[in-house]
Amino acid sequence: MTPAITAGLLHELVTHSHAEGITALDVEAVIEHDDRVLLIAEPGPDFTDDTWQLPAGPVLPGQTLTDALHPAVAAIGLTIDEITGYLGHHDHPGAHATTRVFCFTVTVTDPEAICRAAMHGHRWADPGDLPDPFHPAAWRWPATGPGGAARQ
């Protein structure tokens, strides 16, 4: 069971992160449709092989975690209908700072709009092929990962 998303929970998550010295925050969206999870192809470092990731984006100054989900999902041509749950977080150490990534489940108004947008490689992956849902950082594979080539 995922915790209810309340203003108190969102405030606590950010406050706890800042108390740990982590101020760079991102969000990820788990979007399910027809019992599959949406993964987006992102170019690898230095234009190496793509990796498969959940739709994600930064939390900008003045945004709540849930505010930041909307532009992250809109960037791939989808619109959030409802934010349905909070799954947890994971940290990404970087060269200058650690980024904390918060993972939420969402529903979207028209899941097939991603097909019409065609600006991103994507795939709808079987959740059984995915690692532990509480560690979405592990949901990144080379383009040869689960499901084969990107569906455009």
Model-predicted regions and their roles:
Residues 80-82, 89-113:
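Active-site-adjacent beta-strand/loop module that shapes the phosphate/pyrophosphate-binding cleft
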Residues 103-105, 113-147:
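NUDIX/MutT-family hydrolases
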Residues 19-23, 51, 95-100, 116-119:
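A generic structural micro-feature
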Residues 1-28:
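Acidic, metal-coordinating catalytic segment for phosphate/diphosphate chemistry
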Residues 33:
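A cytosolic small-molecule/anion-sensing beta-strand core signal
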